[in-house]
């Protein structure tokens, strides 16, 4: 039983206590900031975004996780960008296909393997306007050693995380 948990670093204490109370071990995988993912030949590939309002004229591709779970008060929306210029897509390959074919589109993305960026003709750009630190951790019951196949998966996960474009 393995799970990958992603959260804002600022919420680390909450998740650490949550997992400890439930007898779950947390193993860090990587820390990162979301980056702007866009077509390598599009206008955003050459532009540095210093304020999120600069993205208002571009089309945002959103995955189904654009709201943060458990947000009390506020609207739970991760970042406020023009809601009139959004495409909601629930399948990762379709997102990449849209980004590939629509040079004025972008999405917020976690680190990715270089081979995926090359395959879909995309670029991952750091964005000074979005600096939220995120953390991926592997979570599993703290009941001794992992089975060999679980440990092989964990080792592969660490290897892939280390080789991603951040």
Where are the language model's segments positioned?
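Hydrophobic hinge/microswitch elements
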Residues: 1, 65-124
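Residue-level signal for nonpolar/aromatic packing positions in well-ordered secondary structure
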Residues: 1-2, 36, 55, 138, ...
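Secondary-structure junction motif
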Residues: 6-8, 12, 45-46, 50-81, ...
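Structural motif
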Residues: 6-8, 40, 63-67, 110-111, ...
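Ligand-binding clamshell of periplasmic/extracellular solute-binding protein-like
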Residues: 7-23
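Flexible hinge/capping segments at coil-to-helix
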Residues: 18-60
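Short beta-strand->loop
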Residues: 22-31, 109-111, 119-133, 142
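A late-sequence structural motif
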Residues: 123-165
């Amino acid at each position: 039983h393995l799970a990958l948990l992603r959260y804002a670093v600022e919420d680390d204490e909450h998740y650490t206590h949550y997992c400890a109370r439930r007898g779950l071990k947390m193993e860090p995988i990587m820390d990162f900031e979301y980056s702007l993912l866009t077509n390598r030949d599009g206008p955003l590939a050459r532009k540095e975004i210093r304020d999120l309002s600069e993205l208002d004229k571009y089309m945002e591709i959103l995955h189904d996780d654009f709201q943060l779970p458990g947000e009390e008060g506020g609207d739970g929306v991760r970042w406020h960008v023009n809601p009139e210029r959004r495409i909601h897509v629930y399948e990762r390959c379709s997102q990449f296909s849209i980004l590939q074919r629509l040079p004025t589109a972008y999405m917020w993305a976690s680190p990715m393997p270089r081979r995926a960026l090359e395959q879909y003709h995309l670029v991952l750009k750091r964005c000074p306007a979005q600096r939220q630190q995120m953390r991926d951790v592997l979570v599993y019951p703290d009941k001794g050693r992992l089975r060999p196949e679980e440990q092989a998966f964990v080792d592969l996960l660490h290897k892939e995380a280390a080789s991603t474009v951040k």
